[in-house]
Regions:
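N-terminal small/polar loop signature for handling phosphorylated ligands or for N-terminal nucleophile
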Residues: 2, 26-77, 231
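N-terminal G-site helix/loop of the GST-like fold
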Residues: 7-32
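Short hydrophobic beta-strand segments
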Residues: 1-6, 215-219
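Glycine-rich, Lys/Arg-enriched anion-binding loops that position phosphate/diphosphate groups
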Residues: 135-221
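Gly/His-enriched, cation/cofactor- and phosphate-binding structural elements
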Residues: 48, 187-289
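Short, highly selective alpha-helical patches that border small-molecule cofactor pockets
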Residues: 11-15, 107-108, 228, 261, ...
Length: 289
């Protein structure tokens, strides 16, 4: 068994759910990746079971699916990104793949639903609901943001981390001690982060243009659009980026009904949602204007 998952809270949670229900905690079987990172599927065995959770594919990256199909792998593709929805719409031959493709809930929520045959998000564990509420930008739950910041205080929340095992065990035992502790830590972390980000934006945020749209930019990859605070409301788009030594990694965001972040990201080889997407480049074309 192999599992490829997206490199964010939702993807790691989805990977953790795979680990729990398959009882596979072998680190070598899990691969964290961004939208257009190279995937190690050439090393996968023929007829191997491969979970692709919270992971988007586009016209430029569907060759990975084709390779897995040629290898006669059992593919379980669970995803909620707009890019994936459009790919499946344009290529009905992929509809035969096992899994769930739906934009209604996050990748982690869909992964839980897949393994447990759960239909209603409210029947998912509380931690899954928080992850989905944040990742889909629904903000229907009071403590969602505090939970997100609290998770960032955890030194390791990869899919094999004990934090997920605690969450799941507490779900089945009908108590929420660990989640409550995470939320308490998140309240403190959020206040600290807001103060730091406000000063950081004051000194380093700048405005560029992305596909004809004014965009507020910050060289700070973690935190997403939340790093801008109220400043994000003044521009139709926002962008955070970081250089990893080889590539510039970009995340873009927008609440403008006329801006499709996934379409912009796909032009650069990436993908994602209408309101949030990502890609990477070898250069930095988004200069200050």
């Amino acid at each position: 068994m192999k599992c490829i998952f997206h490199c964010d809270l939702d993807g790691r949670c989805a990977g953790a759910i795979v680990a729990y229900f398959t009882n596979n905690y072998n680190k070598e079987d899990y691969y964290e990746a961004n939208y257009n990172d190279p995937l190690p599927i050439d090393s996968y065995e023929n007829k191997e079971t491969v979970y692709l959770v919270d992971f988007s594919f586009t016209e430029d990256t569907k060759h990975y699916l084709d390779t897995l199909i040629k290898k006669e792998c059992k593919i379980i593709h669970i995803d909620h990104h707009t890019s994936t929805m459009e790919l499946y719409e344009n290529h009905p031959e992929y509809a035969k793949l096992e899994g769930i493709r739906s934009s209604e809930h996050s990748g982690a929520a869909l992964t839980w639903m897949y393994f447990t045959d759960t239909k209603d998000i409210k029947d998912c564990p509380l931690f899954v609901q928080y992850v989905s509420d944040f990742d889909c930008w629904h903000w229907k739950m009071k403590e969602t943001e505090n939970f997100k910041f609290g998770m960032e205080t955890v030194s390791n929340y990869g899919p094999l981390s004990m934090i997920w095992t605690k969450f799941i065990k507490e779900h089945y035992n009908k108590y929420t001690e660990t989640i409550e502790d995470i939320i308490k830590k998140g309240k403190i972390a959020k206040k600290y982060s807001a103060n730091i980000n406000k000063e950081y934006c004051k000194n380093f945020a700048y405005v560029t243009e992305v596909e004809g749209n004014k965009c507020i930019v910050l060289n700070k990859k973690d935190g997403g659009s939340l790093v801008f605070g109220d400043l994000v409301k003044e521009y139709p788009m926002s962008m955070v980026w970081a250089f990893d030594g080889e590539y510039y990694q970009y995340s873009i965001y927008s609440q403008d009904p006329n801006i499709f972040c996934n379409k912009i990201a796909e032009k650069y080889g990436g993908g994602g949602h209408k309101g949030a997407a990502g890609f990477r480049l070898e250069d930095m074309p988004f200069k200050k204007i």
